[in-house]
Design a protein with these regions (language model features):
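Non-heme Fe(II) oxygenase metal-center motifs and adjacent flexible, charged/small-residue loops
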Residues: 1-190
Length: 190
């Protein structure tokens, strides 16, 4: 069987809030995780980002996207590389597994992120305004040193301590729609 855990997030919020939780699937197929890590090492990542109408050099994270069809980058327009799932076989196996486990056909696209210096870079607190369905597949030895941190916010201020969820090499993290943070810009509700 699988080693799965539901992490309840709502009890951490001191004010009334919608139910939120995350599913963590630990250690599925170490062989697939090893192959996925190996394949990500040879990717030519995009090192730019598009913010506030401008293309800038990305210092905190580098990325490429994955989907059924490939697409070349257009840096001057802020359009990132899309690699075909067929060229990311181990990642595609992981996607097929978690899609089947969740009984969903909605995991069509992915984003492969690389943090150039795991000890000095990361991203700040934010929600995901574009996606309600999000799955994270963590690979790499540094995973154990970098848990996922979640926090409840209201009116732009934190209303609880960070909720840390440790993830290891080959673990999946599946937040509920509320935990994804699609409403993160709505300041009045946690």
């Amino acid at each position: 069987g699988l080693d799965c855990e539901i992490v309840e997030l709502t009890p951490h919020c001191p004010v009334p809030a919608e139910e939120a939780c995350a599913l963590v699937v630990r250690g599925w197929s170490p062989e697939t995780a090893d192959a996925a890590l190996k394949s990500t090492a040879s990717i030519a990542y995009d090192t730019f980002m598009y913010m506030h109408g401008k293309v800038k050099n990305a210092h905190t994270r580098h990325l490429v996207f994955a989907a059924e069809r490939a697409r070349d980058p257009e840096r001057e327009r802020g359009v990132h590389t899309v690699l075909p799932w067929s060229g990311l076989e181990a990642m595609d196996r992981a996607r097929a597994f978690i899609s089947g486990a969740l009984d969903t056909q909605h995991l069509k696209a992915g984003c492969v992120l690389k943090y150039p210096d795991i000890n000095r870079t990361g991203i700040g607190w934010h929600g995901d305004g574009e996606r309600r369905i999000t799955v994270l597949y963590r690979v790499g030895a540094a995973s154990a040193r970098r848990p996922i941190h979640l926090m409840w916010f209201q009116k732009g201020e934190a209303v609880c301590a960070p909720i840390s969820i440790p993830l290891g090499h080959g673990d999946f993290f599946v937040p509920s729609a509320k935990a994804v943070g699609t409403d993160w810009k709505l300041r009045n509700k946690p």
